[in-house]
Amino acid sequence: MATRAVARRQPAASGETGAAGSVRATGEIADRDLVGMYLDEIARTPLLDAAKEVELSQTIEAGVYAGKILDGEVDSDSAGASREELEALVAEGERAKDVFIRSNLRLVVAVARRYPRSGLPLLDLIQEGNAGLVRAVEKFDYAKGFKFSTYATWWIRQAITRSIADQSRTIRLPVHLVEELGRIRRVQREFNRENGRDPEPAEIAAELSSTPERVTDVLDWARDPVSLNMSVDDEGETQFGDLLEDTSAVSPEQSVLTLLRSEELDDLIGQLDDRTASIIKMRYGIEDGRERTLTEVGKQHGLTRERIRQIEKHALLELKRMAHDTGFDAAA
């Protein structure tokens, strides 16, 4: 997997040669080649149907339970199995987990590609998403009745967006840029004190014998904090502020357990009008496991993205209210 990169591309140093630019371009081509190789590799693993997901989940569950017996967390007398049999169950569970993960790696790529403006290479996003997928496999409860792809998408997205947010907090400037930024800031302060306003890039450049473009590059690179309104996904639906942790929010798992139990959700959605029900099903991939963007749903229904967003928000509040009234949320 590619080495983690900083969240923004570093501006070229003054006087950068064409050779340096060629090296960067070659690196970008190499990254694309690696992505292609990775996609070819994971495409060899067949997708799972619902029955196979249940079978693998049961094998994983048995392996976890056997491991607890071996570790003394569960009374071994109640198991009725030898140590060798328990160790075999643990090994089978690990193999099942590996198959489950490898069969869903394409889902990670699909989610990672939604964040082309994140500033992170696609391979890094995939690596973070894979960690979310592993967590989803470990936490998935097949007995709840909801689709694994829908459940896993929450964990994959959480891992990716958290990584994007973390990267923004750990951006570090090279020494030469720190010094250059210091000179720019000094000119800004002096100019503001003398003129009562902030200087334009051209005015700063004149003081430093630089160029307006160079000043803009350095300021853009060093800007902190990143604009909370900066779009990071392909559809403009996720802004940087959406990635910052909300400690008061329920976890993705809690949200899924509350809203995505298939039988209960069908009952609740059945109480919505046809258009709203269709929008919710498309947005969350309830019927086919593929989540649609606001734009896709809007085109399907002849509505704007903003109108779809409003309908979705109202519908989720209504579903939450109905779940509370019927006691579904209490059972989650």
From Swiss-Prot:
Record family assignment: Belongs to the sigma-70 factor family.
Organism encoding this protein: Streptomyces griseus
Motif placement: Polymerase core binding: 124-137
Transmembrane segments: none
Role, per record: Sigma factors are initiation factors that promote the attachment of RNA polymerase to specific initiation sites and are then released.
InterPro entries registered for this protein in UniProt: RNA_pol_sigma-70_dom, RNA_pol_sigma70, RNA_pol_sigma70_r1_2, RNA_pol_sigma70_r2, RNA_pol_sigma70_r3, RNA_pol_sigma70_r4, RNA_pol_sigma_r2, RNA_pol_sigma_r3/r4-like
GO biological process, one term: DNA-templated transcription initiation
Keyword Ribosomal protein in record: no
Keywords: DNA-binding, Sigma factor, Transcription, Transcription regulation
A Pfam cross-reference name: Sigma70_r3
Protein name: RNA polymerase principal sigma factor HrdD
SUPFAM superfamilies, sorted: Sigma2 domain of RNA polymerase sigma factors, Sigma3 and sigma4 domains of RNA polymerase sigma factors
Spans annotated as Disordered: 1-21
GO molecular function, one term: sigma factor activity
DNA-binding interval(s): 294-313
